[in-house]
A protein has these predicted regions:
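Conserved C-terminal beta-signal and adjacent last beta-strands/turns
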Residues: 6-10, 15-19, 23-25, 125, ...
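Acidic, small-polar-rich N-terminal luminal/periplasmic segments of exported/outer-membrane proteins
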Residues: 27, 35, 46-180, 198, ...
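Transmembrane beta-barrel wall of Gram-negative outer-membrane proteins
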Residues: 193-225, 234-274, 291-305, 403-409, ...
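Membrane-embedded beta-barrel scaffold of Gram-negative outer-membrane proteins
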Residues: 191, 213, 219, 313-329, ...
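Gram-negative outer-membrane beta-barrel transporters
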Residues: 349-351, 360-362, 369, 406-408, ...
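Structural signature of Gram-negative outer-membrane beta-barrels, strongest in the C-terminal barrel
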Residues: 255, 386-543
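Short loop/turn motifs that connect adjacent beta-strands in outer-membrane beta-barrel proteins
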Residues: 44, 159, 175-185, 211-214, ...
Length: 730
């Protein structure tokens, strides 16, 4: 018998043309720490819709001007969500979501129907390569985050393997975020509570800047402690956890040309929950309760050289990450662990040219990174862990991209062709090595007939190399009862068990995609009031994805037959490949994914409204079955009123989902839902209380019982939230 799992885990106007000098000043150093604004400016940024994207083209541009879809969620919007985890903010991003359920330890992202190895995660440019069948991937506390970029669509032309569905890039806080002009030191302290899981949070940030502005330092420490999650269904989801997060970052500017920075970020999590923390999986035989310890460290160094010449704007980044998850079974002596280390270095440069009405930015560079994994299980003879091979992967890449803009009588045209070459190698002890390479081209184009209108399109190819987990998976996968024979204690005792083993497959080939996208956007200012703005951008995309990697699980059907149900010639039930009782990753499916995404934002001195819409469909080309991490049609709205020159903001959010019937098994269909949140922010911008911020709110105000499709469990119920913070500069 074969059980088949899901095959795929898987806004700027003409004025941007004149801002080229400003973005050049930001330069490639923005890949690690983008150009910043002081806290007084950031506090008023709730209406600043001209967010800058760093990762969409590796060259800072306004997100609106990108020839595709990218969302930039800035610090002020993140803070208004008063998030417990980064998953809380993803309603603000069309076409992207966090699945795996409400437990922090099981949250995984998906973008445009792809997840797992199909989505690249970057922390300040450092790749986060930790991947597990059931564990989460977001080892970062929201308190440390100054912006999140979600580039949707294939981006292998810049980032290589893994950017099949898109890139989620997290940018962490800097000292500049906390200091006004002339201030040399500052502190921020905060404390918060939310009722749905009885979570308390405390955090402290300290910053310092030298008299000559050449050196600055920022440090943060945050602790969260929470209990079980109260679901909208009325049930509790076991999820006791404690999170300790810290960040230390320093920047040195010896001259106007040079910027050097270094950082260390740590995420430590301890929780008591089932071995598989995703969905509504209860603890029990085969999914024992574990004391889970997460230790994630990211160290990074960055050097930017940006002299007066237009030919050099170079950025060198080196990083090391270590992510270790250890699980001690509560009721046994078994301990298992997975450790993934990544060392990487990238070098890129931007050369800029201008000739009359034309300008060209040529971005080019190379990258190398190495992943190494070690799995341990103290209950196996050789201490190795089933499904977690001791293996290494190496990636070498070189890329080039041109951004050519020409301003003529019919508007501004921009053409952005790019290409990247990658070579990748996988090795494991006692197994054959694998080698392959890929070329990933992409081209995007935009046209602005007038400054307020943008028309764009793009085409690109992307790939996702097979991971060492998929190629070299071996040892025990799971055990099942063998009902076809009496148990060791006879017919009235417990059954005998047989073992399903992983089988390596060195013949896997990369997943590949070809995507095209077309869209348009509008950008207006001074519509109803002086200084107000409205932006909207939408697109339709279609992706053809081939060679999808799927885990095939084969079990002899006779294992489920009693002795009196057996018939002559029936294959025996046993353990391993000899009996057909094995699991193996194979290339099995070609899929077509398509969808629509729309974002719109309005802001004024009196009120704001932002929202988005997304729909997606995914089909198996061979049999028309649904494939991918699909979701219902989604509408998200976030709006509110501003009082006392913005010192007080009252807002509300609503998420609306249609009925979900894009399923192969009717049992997996889900009803639609409408969920609303309310919130208030008091943040005096002047006077003696400047620096104080009070956040009050309630999520899921109606205590709705609803399921997010990719979560597999009812979502958290009504959740009252409160946070108080104070910031002072000196």
């Amino acid at each position: 018998m074969m059980k088949r799992q899901d095959a795929i885990r898987g806004l700027g106007g003409e004025r941007a043309f004149f801002k080229a000098a400003l973005f050049r000043a930001a330069g490639a150093a923005a890949l690690a720490t983008v150009s910043t604004v002081g806290p007084a400016q950031a506090d008023m940024a709730a209406g600043d819709l001209d967010e800058v994207t760093v990762y969409a083209t590796r060259n800072p541009i306004e997100a609106f001007d990108y020839a595709g879809q990218v969302s930039v969620i800035p610090k002020d919007v993140i803070d208004d969500f008063n998030p417990s985890s980064l998953a809380d903010i993803f309603d603000a991003v069309p076409g992207a979501a966090i699945g795996g359920g409400p437990r922090r330890s099981g949250m995984t992202p998906d973008v445009r129907g792809l997840s797992g190895e199909g989505v690249l995660i970057l922390f300040d440019g450092a790749r986060q390569s930790y991947l597990s069948g059931h564990d989460g991937r977001f080892f970062v506390d929201p308190e440390l985050v100054r912006a999140v970029e979600v580039v949707r669509g294939p981006t292998s032309a810049l980032y290589g393997s893994g950017a099949l569905g898109g890139v989620i890039a997290v940018r962490t806080i800097t000292a500049q975020d906390f200091l006004d002009e002339g201030q040399r030191a500052g502190v921020k302290v905060s404390s918060g509570y939310q009722s749905v899981n009885d979570e308390w949070r405390m955090g402290a940030t300290g910053v310092w800047r030298s008299e000559d502005d050449k050196v600055d330092v920022v440090g943060n420490f945050t602790i969260r402690n929470s209990g079980d999650i109260e679901l909208g269904s009325g049930l509790d989801l076991e999820a006791d956890d404690e999170i300790l997060s810290s960040l230390l970052k320093t920047t040195f500017r010896p001259s106007e040309e040079w910027t050097l920075s270094a950082s260390w970020m740590r995420y430590g999590g301890n929780s008591v929950d089932p071995n598989n923390p995703q969905g509504n999986n209860p603890a029990g035989p085969g999914n024992e309760n574990v004391d889970r310890d997460i230790d994630s460290n990211t160290l990074q160094g960055n050097v930017n050289y940006n002299p007066a010449t237009n030919l050099i704007d170079a950025n060198l980044v080196g990083y090391f990450t270590r992510n270790t998850v250890t699980e001690d079974e509560i009721d046994t002596t078994r301990t298992v662990s997975r450790e993934v280390e990544t060392f990487g270095v990238s070098l890129d440069n931007r050369s800029r040219f201008e000739a009359g009405p034309a300008s060209l930015t040529f971005t080019y560079g190379g990258e190398f990174y190495r992943d190494e994994q070690v799995g341990r299980d103290n209950m196996t003879a050789d201490m190795t862990r089933g499904g977690v091979p001791d293996a290494t992967a190496k990636f070498y890449g070189a890329f080039a991209q041109a951004e050519l803009s020409v301003k003529g009588p019919v508007g501004l045209f921009t053409l952005v062709p790019g290409v990247r070459w990658d070579r990748f190698e996988n090795d494991a002890v006692g197994e054959p090595s694998t080698r392959d390479e890929a070329v990933s081209p992409k081209v995007g184009a935009t046209w602005k007939p007038v400054p307020q209108l943008l028309v764009f399109g793009n085409w690109g190819q992307a790939f996702r190399a097979p991971s060492f987990n998929e190629i070299y998976a071996d040892n025990v996968h799971f055990q099942i009862p063998n009902l076809s024979v009496p148990g060791p204690l006879g017919p009235f005792g417990p059954p005998a068990f047989v073992t399903n083993f992983f089988i390596p497959n060195p013949d896997l080939v990369p997943e590949e995609s070809e995507t095209w996208e077309v869209g348009a956007g509008v950008d207006f200012e001074n519509i109803l009031f002086d200084g107000d703005s409205f932006m909207a951008k939408g697109s339709y995309y279609q992706s053809d994805v081939t060679n999808l990697i799927d885990l095939e699980v084969n079990i002899p059907f006779t294992c489920f037959l009693t002795p009196d149900q057996l018939f002559p010639g029936a294959p025996p039930c046993g353990s391993g490949e000899a009996f057909g009782n094995y699991s193996r990753n194979v290339n099995v499916t070609n899929a077509e994914l398509d969808g629509v995404e729309v974002e719109a934002q309005y802001d004024s001195a009196y009120f704001w409204l932002r929202g988005n819409f997304a729909t997606i469909d995914g089909r198996d080309v061979a049999n028309d079955d649904y494939v991918g991490v699909l979701s219902p049609d989604m509408i998200f709205l976030d709006g509110g009123l501003k009082f006392f020159s913005g010192d007080l903001r009252l807002g509300a959010r609503v998420s609306i989902a249609s009925d979900f019937n894009k399923v192969n098994d009717p049992a997996n269909a889900r009803d639609g839902y409408t969920v609303g949140d309310v919130y208030a922010v008091w943040q005096p911008m002047s006077g003696k209380l400047k620096g104080l911020r009070v956040d009050l709110g309630a999520d899921n105000v109606t205590d709705a019982d609803y399921d997010v499709v990719a979560a597999g469990v009812s979502q958290p119920g009504r959740n009252f939230k409160a946070t108080v913070s104070w910031r002072q500069g000196f």
